[in-house]
């Protein structure tokens, strides 16, 4: 990704939470494209994907707390022409799924979006098990993987549309 489109007239939206920007953007993308899929791992409330589930139930799958399997499902959906967006806490969307992301997504050149919420040390309220230091670094080592860490809701919305 050489350029994130839509940021030429950048204005910060300081009143919007990242999860709300995610929810609004995914609702728009779901309306525009039936191939958009949202995959959750029992975190629809914390990731604000419940509205997408209500609006597009056929485009939503809750796989339960099994992040590694969810990456395999995302890869399979991508191989069949869908565009999956997988939501998980950052530590579980990176360290826990590394092998599946490497082989099933990167090595296979598939278009699966893995969204890790509360990346890095940003999830202090959830304790040390949710605070990886290496999350972005290990994902950057995967061939064909693009790692983006949007700083605010405007950047997040732009990245999701790419």
PLM segments and residue spans:
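Thiamine diphosphate
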Residues: 1-162
């Amino acid at each position: 990704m050489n350029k994130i489109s839509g940021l030429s007239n950048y204005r910060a939206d300081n009143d919007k939470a990242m999860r709300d920007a995610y929810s609004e953007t995914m609702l728009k993308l779901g309306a525009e494209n039936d191939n958009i899929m949202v995959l959750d791992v029992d975190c629809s409330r914390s990731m604000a994907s419940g509205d997408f589930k209500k609006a597009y139930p056929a485009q939503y799958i809750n796989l339960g707390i099994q992040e590694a399997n969810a990456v395999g499902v995302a890869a399979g959906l991508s191989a069949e022409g869908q565009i999956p967006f997988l939501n998980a806490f950052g530590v579980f969307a990176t360290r826990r799924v590394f092998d599946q992301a490497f082989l099933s997504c990167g090595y296979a050149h598939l278009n699966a979006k893995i969204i890790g919420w509360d990346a890095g040390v940003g999830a202090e309220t959830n304790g040390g098990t949710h605070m990886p230091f290496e999350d972005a670094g290990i994902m950057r080592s995967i061939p064909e993987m693009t790692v983006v860490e949007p700083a605010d809701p405007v950047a997040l919305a732009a990245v999701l549309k790419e």
